[in-house]
Regions:
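ATP/nucleoside-binding phosphotransfer catalytic cores, i.e., glycine-rich phosphate-binding loops
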Residues: 83, 88, 96, 112-116, ...
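Short, cationic-aromatic polyanion-contact patches
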Residues: 235-242, 256, 287-302
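Flexible coil/turn residues that form the inter-helical turn or adjacent wing/linker of helix-turn-helix
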Residues: 253
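A short, conserved structural fragment
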Residues: 279-289
């Protein structure tokens, strides 16, 4: 969509978003005002959480929508300010990490201007209930039902063994301040957009929710959580390299084998064996890169 199309997003009855969950996340980054409900579709060999409609079922589903056989879920977003500057809102999560992996980051967490902790960790994630089954969960956070009006705060791999994730009301203001690391730190919005940060991150509930079309009979948050629980049980028997690749793909999106080796600092042979394990288990799929037909990329199939 062009910028003008985004501004007219409330002048139509329905918006269809291709590209799976990433397409929906990108759309709601651009639209900060009220929008028509969004129907997300995904490729036939994948599944989605936000996008729950197989592209093969699109024609039949439009007939159901025309008859009014659908519901609209309103899910809240996070308003984000980086060093005092407002940036695009997020639907899943906002994370702050050092630009170099396996590097500690000092920070102070404040809620409604009151200091909750001072911590040294690999980073921090603030998620909505919608995002609680994404990167937040893989970092040790809880799974939260989508209609809950809460934020989830996770300090990733804290040096303090007693540090636990926080669940707080979403009418609070969350600030991550006094950020210090050996390397410059970055904000990551919904696992995609990155930008530098110097000192502080402020988050609050965005005044305009996202509207998502749900067709009756489609997978619910309960079934998604059940699938995530089965994955968590399977993770116990996975080699550490496979777990790391899963987390990296969830955080970074689709990557080539070489990219995975660079991001995780694992030898290419180890990455190759871990990918074979994940492909066999059905957690990852391999596809041809649209940028280079000779290159194969890997992405989650959850």
């Amino acid at each position: 969509m062009r910028d003008g199309d985004y501004r007219a997003a409330n002048d139509v009855d329905l918006i269809i978003s291709a590209g799976g969950d990433r397409g929906i996340l990108d759309y709601f980054h651009k639209v900060v005002t009220d929008s028509a409900p969004v129907l997300g579709i995904y490729e036939s060999d994948s599944t989605g959480f936000l996008a729950q409609l197989d592209v093969r079922d699109l024609e039949a589903s439009l007939v159901r929508i025309d008859k009014g056989n659908f519901e609209i879920d309103q899910v809240f977003r996070i308003a984000v300010r980086v060093d005092g500057r407002e940036v695009e809102p997020v639907l899943n999560d906002v994370a702050v990490f050092p630009s170099k992996s396996a590097t500690l980051m000092e920070h102070v967490l404040r809620i409604d201007e009151k200091t909750v902790w001072r911590d040294n960790s690999d980073g921090l994630i603030l998620s909505t209930p919608t995002g609680s089954t994404a990167y937040s969960m893989s970092a040790g956070g809880p799974m939260v039902l989508q209609k809950s009006q809460v934020f989830v705060v996770v300090s990733v791999n804290s040096l303090d063994n007693t540090r636990r994730p926080l669940i707080i009301p979403n009418d609070t203001t969350v600030e991550v301040a006094d950020i210090v690391s050996r390397y410059h730190c970055e904000i990551v919005l919904d696992g995609g957009t990155r930008m530098g940060i110097k000192k502080s991150l402020q988050c609050s509930k965005h005044e305009v929710p996202a509207k998502l079309v749900r067709l009756s009979g489609n997978s619910s948050i309960i079934s998604v959580i059940a699938k995530k629980v089965r994955l968590a049980e399977d993770l116990l028997s996975m080699p550490p390299s496979a777990k790391l690749l899963l987390k990296t793909l969830e955080y970074e999106g689709a990557l080539s084998q070489r990219d995975l080796s660079t991001r995780t600092m694992l030898p290419e042979r180890t990455v190759r064996l871990a990918l074979r394990h994940l492909l066999t288990r059905g957690y990852v799929k391999k596809k041809t890169s649209l940028r280079d037909a000779r290159q194969r990329i890997y992405e989650l199939k959850l």
